[in-house]
């Protein structure tokens, strides 16, 4: 179980609801992933009209917890307004907070992110901020009241995997009581397993599953990878070494193989 604010969730894989080839494949992929939390864009819901209503019906059929996001927002004001609309529409205080600074990299505006998090937390929101791997930013978000931090592995949709491994490890070491979720940039199941091996509580995926040749099979692969990575972390991974260490005992080695 992993704790998100005052709720305990069984699956450590969070999944997005965009970019799938069809609504049916989206539903099947989410089911196969075993995810309990699904992110949804308010912009898609608000602008979709009848199509938006149909999409929302599909999500409700899955029986999952909805995590609305502020995707596409590029200012504090826009993000705060979108979050308030999402609370009214979805009936939840949860919000995945995104404030984007750059169109090419989709890098978070960390200054605006902290400001928006402060405003929303004071207004009763439980904020899931999408941020960089910068420790100082994460600490400011914690000071703003965030109990969940979602640093990226790499730019959104890049599929590059974990680029700044040491920085993500530092976040885990310095924020032991905060729920940490790797969000964005994961492209392969092995990337998700690596994040879990670092001790992260969960990962959030969308493009890597939705854009796979077989999204449903890829959802299953990521589910297994997350489980394997977490199990490995809990089992206690041996540390890396600079030199070889024999795994076969020398006791009982034939004398003619012994080193003089």
Swiss-Prot record:
Belongs to the ThiG family. GO terms for biological process: thiamine diphosphate biosynthetic process. Coiled coil: none annotated. Catalyzes the rearrangement of 1-deoxy-D-xylulose 5-phosphate (DXP) to produce the thiazole phosphate moiety of thiamine. Sulfur is provided by the thiocarboxylate moiety of the carrier protein ThiS. In vitro, sulfur can be provided by H(2)S. Pathway: Cofactor biosynthesis; thiamine diphosphate biosynthesis. This is Thiazole synthase. The active site is at residue 96.
């Amino acid at each position: 179980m992993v704790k998100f604010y005052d709720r305990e969730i069984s699956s450590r894989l969070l999944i997005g609801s965009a970019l799938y080839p069809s609504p049916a494949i989206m539903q099947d992929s989410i089911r196969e992933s075993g995810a309990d939390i699904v992110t949804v864009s308010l912009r898609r819901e608000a602008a979709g009209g009848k199509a938006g209503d149909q999409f929302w019906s599909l999500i409700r059929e899955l029986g999952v917890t909805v995590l609305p996001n502020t995707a596409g927002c590029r200012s504090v004001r826009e993000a705060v307004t979108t979050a308030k609309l999402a609370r009214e529409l979805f009936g939840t205080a949860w919000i995945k907070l995104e404030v984007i600074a750059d169109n090419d990299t989709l890098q978070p505006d960390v200054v605006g992110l902290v400001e928006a998090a402060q405003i929303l937390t004071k207004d009763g929101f439980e904020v899931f901020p999408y941020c960089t791997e910068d420790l100082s930013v994460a600490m400011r978000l914690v000071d703003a009241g965030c109990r969940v931090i979602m640093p990226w592995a790499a730019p959104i949709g890049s599929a590059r995997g974990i680029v700044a491994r040491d920085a993500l490890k530092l976040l885990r070491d310095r924020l032991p009581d905060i729920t940490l979720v790797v969000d964005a940039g994961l492209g392969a199941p092995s990337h998700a397993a690596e994040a879990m091996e670092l001790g992260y509580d969960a990962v959030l995926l969308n493009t890597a599953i939705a854009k796979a040749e077989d999204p449903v099979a890829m959802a299953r692969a990521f589910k297994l990878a997350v489980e394997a990575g977490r199990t490995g972390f809990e089992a206690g991974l041996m540390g890396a070494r600079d030199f070889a260490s024999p795994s076969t005992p020398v006791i009982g080695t034939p004398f003619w193989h012994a080193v003089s």
